[in-house]
């Protein structure tokens, strides 16, 4: 039976206590020119910052080339990093210099890891894992974390924290998470998940059909799939014209069985970023189901020219799909230093469409706390300052079946400011307990 979409509980937010760069161009030839004789040295702070940004933007891809869609040209990763440094700083660094710098950092990181590992067996496994990795993979913390997790084995603490930057003492950076889900260049394809097996194996029995392709490859449990999520600023110019800016956005996609499964992050690494009491992340995960928990890292786009006037609207929209007809409740908790600041609870009916049930939370207003937070963030003079603030800012979104109280989706959001001119980016992870 077709229901009517709509909100049936209060939309109000409640508190738990009470109410840059140069535009100089240059292709392969420019990148191979000698170093400029700048007094700051080969890897001055501005070059190092751009280098770290480029590492996050372009994941290791071996000997393969990357095609830039806006140019149609093919580049190697080191060439892209050199190109990025040139565009951001106006200073030329060659591909060979980039390669050499990556090797230096890889050796430094390998020494740090060996120094931290006390157990000889774990040290031997770590050395074996690192021997099979390229320098680029070692300093790509996403790949490195996956490899070291295998080397540690169950019950061993993480070698380096999820929140550490690529270099010791580097303020405001967390390049351990890739901004792009570039499946072609996945460093280490994750293993299939329990309950999410690909149909490429033995033919399933009629009573056990294969899981749909979006399970394990997007923000989706066996009961609910997030199709879209966005936070935005909108301003009406006239009755028919709106200016809209997306701060963060997860767009609709159509995963296939050939796509890789999501990478995993140990949930214990982010426990301190979210409330610990009943209804907090740890409590929810212990109750399960385990396939409903995700981490989304957003690189938020704060670069907007829309004037913040009285007619401006700050909102959030999201869309979900389910094979079941139910009433869902969506709780959104804004957290600072791991403590809840405000919460909003919305309840939605299903709408039957094309053989499934859809749920839409459309243009839900942002609370005053969030609007003020965005204002203050935008007025900080440097991106590293913004990232330093955002390191202690998180959002926990929990979607439940209103009648059974079953957790359908639990999404932990963490943030940085986008350093790209291409707008907001994101990367999605499964949360697991290794």
Swiss-Prot record:
Q: Which GO terms describe its cellular component?
A: chromatin; cytoplasm; nucleoplasm; nucleus; protein-DNA complex; transcription regulator complex
Q: Where is this region: Disordered?
A: 1-42, 188-215
Question: What happens after mutating residue 429 to A/H?
Answer: Loss of interaction with YAP1 and also activation by YAP1
Q: What is the effect of changing residue 391 to A?
A: Reduced transforming ability
Indicate the impact reported for residue 266 to A.
Reduced transforming ability
* Pfam families in alphabetical order: TEA, YBD
Q: What is its main location?
A: nucleus
Q: Look up what happens after changing residue 393 to A.
A: Reduced transforming ability
Q: In which tissues is it expressed?
A: Preferentially expressed in skeletal muscle. Lower levels in pancreas, placenta, and heart.
The subcellular localization recorded is: Nucleus
Effect listed in the UniProt record for changing residue 380 to A:
Reduced transforming ability
Instruction: Give yes or no: UniProt keyword Amino-acid biosynthesis.
Output: no
Known outcome of mutating residue 299 to A: Important loss of interaction with YAP1 and complete loss of transforming ability
User: Where in this chain does the entry annotate a coiled-coil region?
Assistant: none
**What does this gene product do?**
Transcription factor which plays a key role in the Hippo signaling pathway, a pathway involved in organ size control and tumor suppression by restricting proliferation and promoting apoptosis. The core of this pathway is composed of a kinase cascade wherein MST1/MST2, in complex with its regulatory protein SAV1, phosphorylates and activates LATS1/2 in complex with its regulatory protein MOB1, which in turn phosphorylates and inactivates YAP1 oncoprotein and WWTR1/TAZ.
Subunit structure, briefly? Interacts with YAP1 and WWTR1/TAZ.
Its name, as the record gives it, is Transcriptional enhancer factor TEF-3
Native source organism of the sequence: Homo sapiens (Human)
Its taxonomic path starts at: Eukaryota, Metazoa, Chordata, Craniata, Vertebrata
> Source gene?
TEAD4
């Amino acid at each position: 039976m077709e229901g009517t979409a709509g909100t049936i509980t209060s939309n109000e937010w409640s508190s738990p206590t009470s109410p840059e760069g140069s535009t100089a161009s240059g292709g392969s030839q420019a990148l191979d020119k000698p170093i400029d004789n700048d007094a700051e040295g080969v890897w001055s702070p501005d070059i190092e910052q751009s280098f770290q940004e480029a590492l996050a933007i372009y994941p290791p891809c071996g000997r393969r080339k990357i095609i830039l869609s806006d140019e149609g040209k093919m580049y190697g990763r080191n060439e892209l990093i050199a190109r990025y440094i040139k565009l951001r700083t106006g200073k030329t660094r060659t591909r060979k210099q980039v390669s050499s710098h990556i090797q230096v950092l890889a050796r430094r990181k390998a020494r740090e890891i060996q120094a931290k590992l006390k157990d000889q067996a774990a040290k031997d496994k770590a050395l074996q894992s690192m021997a099979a990795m390229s320098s680029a993979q070692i300093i790509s913390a996403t790949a490195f974390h996956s490899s070291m997790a295998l080397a540690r084995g169950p019950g061993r603490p993480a070698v380096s924290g999820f929140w550490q930057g690529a270099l010791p003492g580097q303020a405001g950076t967390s390049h351990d998470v890739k901004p792009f889900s570039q499946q072609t260049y996945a460093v280490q394809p994750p293993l299939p998940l329990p309950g999410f097996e690909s149909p490429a194996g033995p033919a399933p029995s009629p009573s056990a059909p294969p899981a749909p392709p979006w399970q394990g490859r997007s923000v989706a449990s066996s009961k609910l799939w997030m199709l879209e999520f966005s936070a935005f600023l909108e301003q009406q110019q006239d009755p028919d014209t709106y200016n809209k800016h997306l701060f963060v956005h997860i767009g609709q996609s159509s995963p296939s069985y050939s796509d890789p499964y999501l990478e995993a992050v140990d949930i214990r690494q982010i426990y301190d970023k979210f409330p610990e009491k009943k209804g907090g992340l740890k409590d929810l995960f212990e109750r399960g189901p385990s396939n409903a928990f995700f981490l989304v890292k957003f690189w938020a786009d704060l670069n907007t020219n829309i004037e913040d006037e009285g007619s401006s609207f700050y909102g959030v929209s999201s869309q979900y799909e389910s094979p079941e007809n139910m009433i869902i409740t969506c709780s959104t908790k804004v957290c600072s230093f791991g403590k809840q600041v405000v919460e909003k609870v919305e309840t939605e009916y299903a709408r039957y469409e094309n053989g499934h049930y859809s749920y839409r939370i459309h243009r839900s207003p942002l609370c005053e706390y969030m609007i003020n937070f965005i204002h203050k963030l935008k007025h900080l003079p440097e991106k590293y300052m913004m990232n330093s603030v955002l390191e202690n800012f998180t959002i926990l979104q929990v979607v439940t079946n209103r009648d059974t109280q079953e957790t359908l989706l639990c999404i932990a959001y963490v943030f940085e400011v986008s350093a790209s001119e291409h707008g907001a980016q994101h990367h999605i992870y499964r949360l697991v307990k290794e």
